[in-house]
């Protein structure tokens, strides 16, 4: 499983180098095949291909008569791109996805268990501040009794 946040740089060709600690797991799990797609929070989601397939299958079964379902399909399936990690552990971020997430030179790769989020570094810092402000209020019911 993937965890931790790592600051990375996009190279001149729009690629990131996957941190060494994740490369072997990705090669073993999916032969370096990753699915990148847009997220509603303004970042990108990066899935090992086997983790993406059940999500794709569920999304594809949603009713095309429901406007929210169509919007979700357009966001996630419409932006999805299969990319393969090269021998140096680099992954191309397609221009359309770089534009969507406003990715510039400095990015953050954030492990989220079965996937990664890829953020523009400035957006990551801003959302971290928002997340910390949420913690000042009441916890949602599902987190009551949760302890670290």
Model-identified regions with their sequence ranges:
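A short beta-strand-loop micro-motif that forms or neighbors metal/cofactor-
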Residues: 28-43, 80, 102-119, 123, ...
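Exposed loop/turn and edge beta-strand positions of beta-sandwich/beta-sheet ligand-binding modules
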Residues: 4, 12, 79, 87, ...
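Short, charged/polar, Gly/Pro-enriched secondary-structure boundary elements
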Residues: 25, 54-55, 124-128
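Helix-adjacent hinge/juxtasegments
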Residues: 45-83
